[in-house]
Amino acid sequence: MGIEDNKHVIKAFYEAGNRGDMDACFALLADDIKWTNIGSTKFSGTFVGKQVLTEQLLGPLFGQLKAGISSVVENMIAEGDFVVAQTAGTAETKDGKPYNNSYCQVIKVREGKIAEVKEYFDTELTSSVFGRD
């Protein structure tokens, strides 16, 4: 796949997420996805495989939100198998707190699927909204 194809995969992933279409999001993930959130928040760590990603990251995170995180792609660059996306995410917790964070994701695309993600974000904001434990 070429650079523009890889960027299209990432755009489709964000668009599906914004629609709340988790089936479409998961269809764009490799079965052996490796997702790393930097830092030491309750949502930090490396999650390998769709089931682990769901059980250990997405379930706990989205379980605390009224709806998903709406993402706006501000910048996207690509080279080879990698796409870097700078995004702004907005969400609200079930108890009414805003969770508006900035993200930089370094994403590896393999055979039309998202194979690896390394996500950088404001960890202090995340901990202040969701707690440290």
Residue ranges and their predicted role:
Residues 10-13, 24-26, 33, 49, ...:
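Hydrophobic pocket/interface hotspot
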Residues 8-18, 42-46, 60-65, 86:
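Short, mixed-charge, low-aromatic patches
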Residues 30-79:
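A solvent-exposed, acidic/Ser-Thr-rich amphipathic alpha-helical stretch
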